[in-house]
Amino acid sequence: PQPIIRVVQQINENVVFTAPSMSQRAALYALQHREEVQPALVETFRERMFFAAACINRIPKMHVSYPPKGSFYLFINIKKTGLTSEEVAARILQEAHVLMLPGNAFGACGEGYLRMACTVDKAVIEEAFARIGRMAPFGK
């Protein structure tokens, strides 16, 4: 119904397109003080990325190039599973409760990969890959 669609659109616009004032102030502070803020953030995300890569490479049928290069995203090779990236992403979400994007969301060349953001604490990354490692076709 149209009235519900209008309300949902308004909520979506406010959530997606309008950053809360607290977030705007935090972003402004980070930009104004980037010399003191940035190095610690870069190191934190680098540590998480290397930690996640090590966790991934211990799981059969999953692989990430080492050492990882780039930002806090990893592209995980899952071709040895014999499943599509959408199938693996859906199973991981359903069975391990870990969200990853199927590689084909980035085009045909992304098929056979999953994209993971290393933006959570290392303990969360470790738990996520422990759960994934217990799943068939990875660990069972």
Named regions from a protein language model:
Residues 53, 61-65, 99-104:
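A short linear hydrophobic-aromatic micro-motif
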Residues 12, 48-49, 115, 131:
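Short, cationic motifs built from Arg/Lys/His that form the positively charged side of catalytic pockets
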Residues 1-46, 53-55, 136:
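Conserved core segment of the aminotransferase class I/II
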Residues 82-87, 91-100, 106-140:
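PLP-dependent enzyme catalytic core of the Aspartate aminotransferase-like
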Residues 24, 28, 43-53, 65-78, ...:
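Conserved glycine-rich beta-strand-loop-beta hairpin in the small C-terminal domain of fold type I
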Residues 1, 32, 77-79, 119-121:
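Residue-level recognition of strand-loop junctions within catalytic nucleotide-signaling folds
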Residues 56, 76, 116-118:
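Preference for bulky hydrophobic residues occupying beta-strand positions
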